[in-house]
Amino acid sequence: MKKAIIAMSGGVDSSVAALLTKESGDECIGATMKLYNNEDIGVHREKTCCSLDDVEDARSVAYQMDMPYYVFNFTADFHTEVMDRFVDAYENGCTPNPCIDCNRYLKFDKMFHRMQEIGYDYIVTGHYARVEYDEKRDRYLLKKAVDDTKDQSYVLYMLTQEQLAHVKLPLGGLWKDQVRVIAEKHGFINARKHDSQDICFVPDGDYAKFIEKYTGKKTPEGDFVDKDGNYIGRHKGIIHYTIGQRRGLGIPAASRLYVCEISPKTNTVVLGDNEDLFSSELEADNVNLISVDSLAEPKRVTAKIRYRHKEQPATAWQTPDGILHGKFDEPQRAITKGQAVVMYDGDEVVGGGVINKIYSQS
């Protein structure tokens, strides 16, 4: 009999993952990560991810299954590894994905180490993706979920071989509707609970307001300029903008203007036409490869540049310094620094990294 820690968010997915694991005969405990206090984010919130209501829902489901349940306090780590990185990225003109950092540094690092400390064998999550072992290649593979509308392999690209060997994802072969039916059949309190949509610590979606409250300082205003450096107007501070943004610029113009570039060094935001947003080539650091050891030779892949982006044909390779390069067959709109680029070979995740450079079309 194996021993499993079920990472329970309070949602229906992790609850059904817990049920399926327990029904397999393994010894299970449920655990929810405590990531912050409400006062940390300056709001009273009960209805979004990681809230007190979520803890109570997770506890209810665990007790219903006669499964021990714990809350792991990772608040200090969450501040350092997720919130601080989120703020730093925006202040440096990037648009981060904090869910990936949470997986990288908390769920599959801190909780992974907790699993090892207590002598358990693996972690179970409610992510929609699949982990398989390939005997011929002697490596673990991360694959897309059967339900492509819910596939979350993109946010798991950072998993290492050691981690994949101790991770189980029971929902990878199920459709979301099937998961809800299972939850309803067992009378789970969260069977029809809505999926969380917001960044958990910015529930109102106002990233700039959160950053200014978190840092205790107001971001300095600066200039909007065109791609030739000509002055257009004043902006409210670079943390208010992301690549491709059109609304909220406050600039009267004869044609639509979009945020094309953010320069923290000069505190300027470059505005341009929609066509200025397209580019074909990027570089990424913080690289993790799963299906291969390296990309020393160019490899044909499909690639995503954000979670909701439809994969596009591309060629991927690494330079000797480990930097990941991706060149799309066709120009892509609004490739953004700070977002992850994830490469696929069919349904296998080849690997990915954090975008840190975009090559101009010109």
Language-model region placement:
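ATP-dependent adenylation/nucleotidyltransferase module used to activate substrates
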Residues: M1-Y157, K168, Q178
